[in-house]
Amino acid sequence: MEEAKGPVKHVLLASFKDGVSPEKIEELIKGYANLVNLIEPMKAFHWGKDVSIENLHQGYTHIFESTFESKEAVAEYIAHPAHVEFATIFLGSLDKVLVIDYKPTSVSL
């Protein structure tokens, strides 16, 4: 299959450290969501908590998904001063993190 054209999804799976309060987590999520207003290449942001009954989460409790127009836009986002500043605070609050960038691909049958 050839690489899909179109947007890139930047997905971050996270588990917060035990000492991070629910209020602090809410503040961090709002800060993450606000990056879409500060960094032009970031087109959309969604997040959620694990609700699976399969118990395959490997300790990850939260998922964050950002949408970009290209891989180059993701690189621009990562280097942006607002992201660098936020990431320092955000990552310092996490026990575990996993990041994957992918292009949504449809399968023709």
From Swiss-Prot:
Induction: By salicylic acid (SA) and jasmonic acid (JA). The keyword Metal-binding applies. Mg(2+) binds at residues 36, 39-40, 42. One of its GO terms (molecular function) is metal ion binding. It comes from the Eukaryota. Its cofactor is Mg(2+). Residues 8-102 form the Stress-response A/B barrel domain. InterPro entries: Dabb, Dimeric_a/b-barrel, HS1/DABB1-like. One of its GO terms (biological process) is defense response to fungus. GO terms for cellular component: cytosol; plasma membrane. Keywords: Magnesium, Metal-binding, Plant defense. Heat stable protein involved in defense against fungal pathogens. Possesses antifungal activity against diverse pathogenic fungi. Possesses antimicrobial activity. Possesses ribonuclease activity. Homodimer. This is Stress-response A/B barrel domain-containing protein HS1. The gene is HS1.
